[in-house]
Amino acid sequence: MLKLTDITWLYHHLPMRFSLTVERGEQVAILGPSGAGKSTLLNLIAGFLTPASGALTIDGVDHTTTPPSRRPVSMLFQENNLFSHLTVAQNIGLGLNPGLKLNAVQQEKMHAIARQMGIDNLMARLPGELSGGQRQRVALARCLVREQPILLLDEPFSALDPALRQEMLTLVSTSCQQQKMTLLMVSHSVEDAARIATRSVVVADGRIAWQGMTNELLSGKASASALLGITG
């Protein structure tokens, strides 16, 4: 279980404050207007931002001040952050060993994830030789191979065309179910959220303004639907 209790981030001396509970294995979408604080929320969970106050626990363990490298969390951004001079295999391998000295078990784990992502025939290529969708598959593989219990997505597929984006969302959802991972995904699209998350959280003005069933948001009947431009 992921639990945030009054986690506060001071943005230009204006506090953003979040309280949220996500069950193990749950898939949750984080929605809201631009600048509302969605990415800030993910960065607080990942440890890239240190809160001014509040508490963050994962499976009952306090991780409020744990550095990102030691948190049981993986995060995937729109900018996939692949190293252009490293091959696909090496980029994925970084998720297992920063020194890229992989033992036989780690090698097999890396190739198993690559097969799952459908990129096992691209392992010797450089990122510059790949399409945008292929690069995001590599970045996702690097996250999954770490086998952390929580996966955070900050609009990683927003630059992809609709068909490819839907394909990636399905791949993420299936992979998280197989590995029993908790998923939190920032998105500007309620339709994308509905494909992957039964529950959604709406962030507005640095607060969680609403949380509930994604389908309720889509129907226009939720109190927060208007924040997303949805009318019933």
Curated annotation (Swiss-Prot):
UniProt cross-references to SUPFAM superfamilies, sorted A to Z? P-loop containing nucleoside triphosphate hydrolases (SSF52540)
Q: Which domain of life is it from?
A: Bacteria
Q: What is its EC number?
A: 7.6.2.15
Identify the keywords attached in UniProt to this record, alphabetized.
ATP-binding, Cell inner membrane, Cell membrane, Membrane, Nucleotide-binding, Translocase, Transport
Spell out the InterPro entries in the cross-references: AAA+_ATPase (IPR003593), ABC_SmlMolc_Importer (IPR050093), ABC_transporter-like_ATP-bd (IPR003439), ABC_transporter-like_CS (IPR017871), P-loop_NTPase (IPR027417), Thiamine_ABC_ThiQ (IPR005968)
Instruction: Tell me its family.
Output: Belongs to the ABC transporter superfamily. Thiamine importer (TC 3.A.1.19.1) family.
The protein in question is named Thiamine import ATP-binding protein ThiQ
Question: What does the record give as the organism's lineage?
Answer: Bacteria, Pseudomonadati, Pseudomonadota, Gammaproteobacteria, Enterobacterales
Its gene is: thiQ
